[in-house]
Each structure stands twice: as C-alpha cells, then as structure tokens.
Amino acid sequence: MSRTETDSIGPIEVPEDAYWGAQTQRSLINFAIGDQRMPLAVLHALTLIKKAAARVNDRNGDLPADIARLIEQAADEVLDGQHDAQFPLVVWQTGSGTQSNMNVNEVIAGRANELAGQGRGGKSPVHPNDHVNRSQSSNDCFPTAMHIATAQAVKEQLLPAIAELSSGLAEQAARHMKLVKTGRTHMMDATPITFGQELSGFVAQLDYAEKAIRAALPAVYELAQGGTAVGTGLNAPKGFAEAIAAELAALSGLPFVTAPNKFAALAGHEPLAALSGALKTLAGTLMKIANDLRLLGSGPRAGLAEVRLPANEPGSSIMPGKVNPTQCEALSMLACQVMGNDVTIGFAASQGHLQLNVYKPVIIHNVLQSIRLLADGCSNFNEHCVAGMEPDAEKMAEHLERGLMLVTALNPHIGYDKSAHIAKKAYTEGLTLREAALALGYLTDEEFDAWVRPDKMLEAGSNG
C-alpha cells in the first residue's frame, strides 16, 4: 500500500507506513548505491537541531507555539530511537547532505501531523520546509550535525575507552615495574628494561594521543548553524546563530558555540580533518602496542615467549592446539582502517569548491567509523588481552642472562673498545660475557659481579 506525496518535481508514491515524504523517496530511488546507511548519530543530531530551532523560532515569534510543540514532540520520539527505521538513505547521495536533512524534516513533519490527527505524512499542519526547516538550510544544518555527532561520539565513546585501556596497561605496569628483562632496539638485543617500564611507555603514548584528540575538540564545538545557504545567514533572524548554539549546548550538555566565520564553516572542514589526524595518531599508537605484544608473545616454544597472551579461541583449522594473538590482529587491522579513513577525510575536506564543501557525507561517515572502531578496539583489547596477559618471568630471566648487551655496563670502567671486544668474543665463541671477559683478562670475577648488575642498569646515573 502507498500514498501520494508531492514536491517541486511532482507527485510520487510513498509507502503508506512511512513517515517520510517525496524527497526521501526520490533519494531512495535515485541513489541505490551500496549499503552504507547515513549514520544514525548524524540523523539524531539533525533531529536535535530541529528541536532546538523550533524552540528558538517559537521564542522569536517566528513559529506558532502549537507547531513548535508538535515538532518538539515528534523530535523527542526520534531522539528516543522510536523511528530509526524511518531513515533509510545511504551515505552516497548529494554531497551537502540535503536528502538526509529533508529525510529528517519529512519524518518529523509526518509524525507531527499524525500527532495532530491529520494522518501520517503530508504537509499540514506541519510543513517539512516551512516549519521544521525554518531559519535553516541543509548547508548549515548538515555540517552542524556532523560536529554534534562527532563531539558526542568522542566524549561518550572514545575518551572513556582510551581511559579504560590506559588504566589497564597502567595497572599491569605497576604490577611488573621491578621485573627486569632484555630491552630491544632495531629488533635486536639492547640494555635491560623492566616490563613495567615497557608498558609505561604504552600508557604515555596513549596519553599523548588522548591529548591530541582533546585539543581538536574546541574547533568541533564551533557550529555552522545560522550561516544558512552560503554563510551570510539569509532567512535566519538576527541572533539566531548564537541562540541555537546556546540551545544545542543546553540540550546536549556539550559546550557548543557559534562558529566565528560561517563561510569557512560551510566551505571547509578543517576541524574534522584535524580531529581525524589525532585519531590517526591514536591508531598508530594502538598499532605499536598490538605489534609489540604479539612479538613478545610469539612462540610458545620457538619465539620470544616473554608474555603469555590470553587464549580467546582455537587458532587454526589444521594445526591442533595452536592459539593465535587474535586481539592484537584485530586491533592492528582497525588501526589500518582508521589510517585509510584519514586519507579519505583529508582529501574530502580539501574539496570545498567556492562556498560549499560537497563531500560532507563521506567525511562524517569515515570520522564516525574511525571513532567507533577506536573506541570498541580500546575496550575490547583491554578486556580480552591486556587484563589477562601475564609475563613469563623465567623466560625473561633466561633471555637477560644470555644477552650480550649487558656489556654496556662495562663502558665506564674499561672503555667502549674493550667492552666491544668482550661482546664479540662471547658471540663468536659461544661464551658468556663473564667467560669472555675473564679470558681476555680485562677484569676479575669480582669486578664483573660488581659492575654487570641488570637491576642497576635501569635509570640515569647507573654504573656511572
């Protein structure tokens, strides 16, 4: 069953149970591309804008109070998730996001008209353009929704997940701060380090990435709303930009403000490009952590085997008993995806031709995907890998004892050249450092014991 809806192009049949109208239906027909739906976070952000605009327009006397109440009631239902199925449009549509903006306008109007007893859909008493979209344009609504959805995702999903992983690693670092092991540079044996020190480096890297993300947020809090079509504010009343930013801040609990220059806010997306760069930084940190832990966990008998990673599932369909570092692999894969997303975001953000960037949907699709992947990845990795990993102290001690770079402790006492001679002799002849040093006559047994002490090689000033 269907009903007839109309727009400036003419009549079109719309499913009878749909709240949307003609423009949404045309988009469904004309853009049957892929299956990547416009993120619900964007659609809910657009809905929040409609609610805020109705309040501001009501206060300004630009919207009848009864119409404003109907819009707000319908918007609240959308924000509650009651009508998520009414947003079927894909990312691959007009680059301004106009069709998704109209999808929201039509759904809110269609539900508001039903609440008013006029049946589902239609344009009376609530009109999708004249009332729901009053004082707005898709060109300022959509970039505003992009910023709202992004800020909410970062604050509600990503930052708590980073804190969770950082806390998990910090707990492991504190627990193993005195467990001495071989350090490695260039993938080769180096001077000693503790497992706790190694993990503390991960925590510091996460802290840096988190600070970069937080530093990008103030620009994301700046909203394009009020710029309307080209940034001039045509058809928006004086003071509307400031008023709706304040209303959105109150409704969301986030410190949104009006963008100081609406022309840049419509034509450029530097704030989201900058945030994406920070997300890429976090992805790089997670890649390093995942790679290091799977290297340390390699084995169990023919690898480093210094860390036992939790066994989440059987690892092979052909090799019985094999267990793989799957959490590390998943984390590193999503990091690759985020890095790829950043390339797309950076290119799309550069396409602000004249007064409007028309790559907005692909930008926000990738930004929100990156945030979601990073948030889920941090939480999942902490729960299923970091929390259950355990160091193999015996294996660490074995590698430390066999390591040749302990010879570095002799540099201040016998000099670099003699120390290098000891290391080379030990390596080529299969000797221990002690055996090589004594054979060369460079020091006594007692001096070796006094000077080569791994637990004293862990901080500045050691063996000076």
Swiss-Prot record:
CDD domains: Fumarase_classII (cd01362). The lineage of its organism: Bacteria, Pseudomonadati, Pseudomonadota, Gammaproteobacteria, Pseudomonadales. Gene3D superfamilies: Fumarase/aspartase (C-terminal domain) (1.10.40.30), Fumarase/aspartase (Central domain) (1.20.200.10), Fumarase/aspartase (N-terminal domain) (1.10.275.10). The keyword Ion transport does not apply. Keywords: Cytoplasm, Lyase, Tricarboxylic acid cycle. The keyword Lyase applies. It is found in: Cytoplasm. The record marks E329 as: Important for catalytic activity. Pathway: Carbohydrate metabolism; tricarboxylic acid cycle; (S)-malate from fumarate: step 1/1. Its EC number is 4.2.1.2. GO terms for molecular function: fumarate hydratase activity. The active site is at H186 (proton donor/acceptor), S316. NCBIfam families: fumC_II, PRK12425.1. Involved in the TCA cycle. Catalyzes the stereospecific interconversion of fumarate to L-malate. This is Fumarate hydratase class II. Belongs to the class-II fumarase/aspartase family. Fumarase subfamily. Homotetramer. Substrate binds at residues 96-98, 127-130, 137-139, 185, 317, 322-324. Pfam families: FumaraseC_C, Lyase_1. GO terms for biological process: fumarate metabolic process; malate metabolic process; tricarboxylic acid cycle. It comes from the Bacteria. It catalyses: (S)-malate = fumarate + H2O. GO terms for cellular component: cytoplasm.
